[in-house]
Amino acid sequence: MRMKFFSDNAATVHPHVWAAMQAADAPDTGYDGDTLSRRLDDAFSDLFGKRATALWVATGTAANCLALAAMVPPWGGVVCHREAHIETDEGGAPGFYTHGAKLILAEGDAAKITPATINAALGLIRAGVHQVQPHAISITQSTEYGRVYTPGEVAAIETLAS
């Protein structure tokens, strides 16, 4: 099978995924009250150790930007690489879904940010109400260049964010 890494809006689904979707296609309660949604909520609750609810969305853009909107106020900022997916491929969706949050662009090799490059971007921001203050850090996994963050790299960014 030839692999093509299209947008989630244009790519075809793998035959195994399609078969699973067809097997799950049965009448049920809608609006998150169905059996599959409850099973997914239970699986996430077990994984995170507290009650969690999954939000089903149709596209990756909606998933990315709704997640940002849940974390970042309209007056806040999201630190990301200047070639991060949310900067280069989501159009104006991050600002739209967050009602105005700004992307704070950091540098880094092959579209990967590090604690050092994040701190460099943050060092350009003055404290106070006249500049957007950071509220989240976003990484693209894998990057637009196909590079992957290691668990240690993600942990180092998480430590900085904490």
Language-model-detected regions and their locations in the chain:
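Glycine-rich loop at the start of a catalytic domain that most often binds anionic cofactors/ligands
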Residues: 66-75, 93
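PLP-dependent aminotransferase-class I/II
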Residues: 98-144, 148-156
